[in-house]
Amino acid sequence: MKIKATIERVPGGMMIIPLFLGAALNTFAPGTAEFFGGFTGALITGTLPILGVFIFCVGATIDFRSSGYIARKGITLLLGKIGFAALLGVIAAQFIPDDGIQSGFFAGLSVLAIVAVMNETNGGLYLALMNHMGRKEDAGAFAFISTESGPFMTMVTFGVTGLAAFPWETLAATVIPFLLGCILGNLDHDLRDLFSKVVPAIIPFFAFSLGNTLNFGMLIQSGLLGIFIGVSVVILSGSSLFLLDRFIARGDGVAGVAASSTAGAAVAVPYALAEANASFAPVAESATAIIATSVIVTSLLTPLATVWVDKKIKQKKRRTPPPKNQMTIN
């Protein structure tokens, strides 16, 4: 049976399908984890330890010896995405109450949802697009983009902008697994190869356990809003990253558009932040549902936008004559 191939036909399927299965279990049999307990219960409710292993393995994929072009590209896209999310968060905080919007089309929307949905890029999608287009050096920026996975960067964003405070112990506890992974991955490339293979394999496990914090009612309620947010992510972050890629990273903008998505791992961020700061607890569930929808939407739209921009740039290059000093005289 081609179970994996079938799941991957759904955009972000290895994250979204287990998430929905977990939500189904929590909706129709909410006491399952307590009933079985033991290893089964831990598999259902163990989001944080599973996420800790994921962050460690992501850290192990980072190569400190990346070329200058790859480093410039990766850092530009990384800081650009985080900076844009921070800016939107600061603006949104002026209008959205701490417990989120309670009525109307935007019911359930919170500053947490906005920052988390904008803050993380689907690194796997970016890597696939760049490799498909034959952009090997641009693909190398994946290592930097992947550092957005997990709650740490979102915690930093909230802390730096003053939107929320986290104890230094919490920040340290979040980043230590990542740093340990970085160190081991650079000390031994065999360990990097070993742990890098774990990254995609562990995603369904924390997605399933995370799904057990949701229910179908909230997922259905956030549907249209989640679609709107997903479209906004592609348009807003795609435009800003396109400009940064062209004028800072000295690229043609295509890689920037390819980074205009929401990572599947972002679905875990509201829960993790609520565990670290109880003020996020009232909006964590609705934020998770919005982000889950955005993951699907951006997984569909980001490739279309990337291909469209790449096509337009190639057409422009074909129409532009070479400089006179490069023209040959017969």
UniProtKB/Swiss-Prot annotation:
Record's bilayer topology term: Multi-pass membrane protein
Keyword Transport: yes
Record-linked Pfam families: KdgT (PF03812)
Domain of life from the UniProt record: Bacteria
Reaction(s) the record says it catalyses: 2-dehydro-3-deoxy-D-gluconate(in) + H(+)(in) = 2-dehydro-3-deoxy-D-gluconate(out) + H(+)(out)
Keyword Membrane assigned: yes
Upregulation: Induced by galacturonate and negatively regulated by the KdgR repressor. Is subject to catabolite repression by glucose involving the ccpA gene.
Family to which this protein belongs: Belongs to the KdgT transporter family.
Protein name (Swiss-Prot/TrEMBL): 2-keto-3-deoxygluconate permease
Provenance organism: Bacillus subtilis (strain 168)
